[in-house]
Design a protein with these regions (language model features):
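A short, structured N-terminal alpha-helical element that caps or precedes a catalytic domain
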Residues: 1-64
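Core AdoMet radical
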Residues: 8, 39-45, 104-193, 203-213, ...
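Short, acidic/polar
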Residues: 23-30, 161-169, 190, 217-223
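N-terminal pre-triad scaffold of radical SAM enzymes
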Residues: 1-12, 80-109, 118-125, 129-130
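A short helix->loop->beta-strand "cap" motif at the edges of active sites that frequently abuts
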Residues: 58-65, 148, 201-203, 232
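Short loop/helix-cap segments at secondary-structure boundaries that form the rim of catalytic
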Residues: 16-19, 29-35, 71-80, 113-119
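Short beta-strand elements of ligand-binding domains
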Residues: 61-75
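A structural motif corresponding to the C-terminal lobe/cap of the Radical SAM core domain
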Residues: 171, 176-178, 185-274
Length: 274
C-alpha cells in the first residue's frame, strides 16, 4: 500500500512520474499540504543541483525534507508500488549479474536480488531472466492475473532467453518484447533469440541499441542495420555516462533520430501481422 502521508517531489515530470495529490514537480505551491515528511526523488545525476535547490525550497515550509533516488546511488532495497513511480510499474528484482562497463546498475544495486513480487503490468526489472526459474514463474503467475497487456520495459537479455520462457510469454498479452544489442558481440545472441521467437511478428520484437560507446559512426550504423536484418525493430539510444553529458555531433544525432523511429527506416510496408 502506498504511504499517503509523504510528499513526493520530482525535479521534472517524466512518463514514469506517479499521479497523486501529494506529488509535486518543482517548487512548493502557494497552497500546500499540512506538515508531513517530504522526499525529493532525483533520477538523473544531471538533475542533482536542481534537486538540492528544491530541498532548500521545501525546507522553508517543512521540517523533514530528504533527498535521494537513483542519482544518489539508491540501491533500491525495497519497492512500494505507486510511491515514486506510476501505477502499474513493478520491480520484482534489483541489480544485474553482468558487469557491462557502460552500465551503472551493478555498481548501484549489486548483483541480482529477488524482491517480494508486487502486482503490476509494466515490469521494470533490469534483468528479469537472470532470476531463478522459480521467481520467473511466480512473476508470470502474477502477470497472468492482471488481465492487462504486459510490457517488459526493463528489457530482456537475449543470451539468457530459453524456450520455456517463450511458452510463458505466450500465456500473457504482450504487445512487444524488448531486448538489447549494445555491442557487435551481442548480435549472435539476438539471432538465437529471433530463432526462438519464430511465432512472434517483427512488430513485437524490439531492441534497444546503445550507440556511441567506444565506436565510430560507421560501426554504430552497421550494428543498427544488422539488428534490423535479424528481424527486430531497433531503437537507437546515444550513450551517456553517469555524470557529464556528451554533446554529440549532428551526424550522430541524425543517425540516432533515424534509427529510433521505425517509420523512417523500415524499407517497405510490411505484410499484415508484421
Amino acid at each position: 500500500m502506498i504511504d499517503c502521508k509523504i510528499i513526493r517531489v520530482f525535479p521534472r515530470r517524466t512518463a514514469w512520474t506517479p499521479e497523486s495529490p501529494l506529488v509535486f514537480i518543482g517548487d512548493p505551491p502557494l497552497f500546500r499540504p499540512p506538515e508531513m515528511p517530504v522526499k525529493i526523488s532525483v533520477t538523473f545525476t544531471w538533475d542533482i543541483p536542481e534537486g538540492q535547490r528544491l530541498q532548500r525550497a521545501w525546507e522553508q515550509y517543512y521540517s523533514d525534507v530528504q533527498i535521494g533516488g537513483p542519482a544518489f546511488g539508491d540501491p533500491g532495497n525495497d519497492f512500494t508500488p505507486g510511491r515514486f513511480i506510476k501505477e502499474g510499474v513493478t520491480f520484482t528484482s534489483r541489480g544485474c549479474p553482468n558487469n557491462c562497463p557502460w552500465c551503472f546498475v551493478p555498481e548501484r544495486e549489486g548483483k541480482i536480488r529477488e524482491l517480494e513480487i508486487t502486482n503490476g503490468w509494466i515490469v521494470q526489472d533490469n534483468n528479469l531472466l537472470a532470476c531463478s526459474n522459480y521467481h520467473i514463474r511466480k512473476v508470470f503467475e502474477m502477470l497472468m492475473a492482471q488481465n492487462k497487456a504486459v510490457t517488459f520495459s526493463g528489457g530482456l537479455e537475449a543470451r539468457r532467453l530459453k524456450s520455456w520462457h517463450i511458452e510463458l510469454f505466450k500465456k500473457i498479452k504482450v504487445p512487444e518484447l524488448w531486448f538489447a544489442c549494445d555491442t557487435p558481440a551481442s548480435l549472435k545472441y539476438l539471432k538465437r533469440a529471433n530463432d526462438l521467437l519464430g511465432d512472434f511478428p517483427t512488430r513485437k520484437k524490439r531492441c534497444y541499441v546503445m550507440i556511441g560507446y567506444k565506436e565510430n559512426l560507421a560501426s554504430a550504423e552497421r550494428r543498427l542495420k544488422n539488428v534490423y536484418a535479424l528481424g527486430f525493430l531497433p531503437f537507437s539510444q546515444l550513450y551517456q555516462p553517469k555524470t557529464k553529458r556528451i554533446k554529440y555531433s549532428q551526424e550522430w544525432r541524425d543517425l540516432n533520430r533515424h534509427w529510433s523511429r521505425p517509420a523512417l527506416y523500415r524499407e517497405k510496408p510490411r505484410t499484415k501481422g508484421e
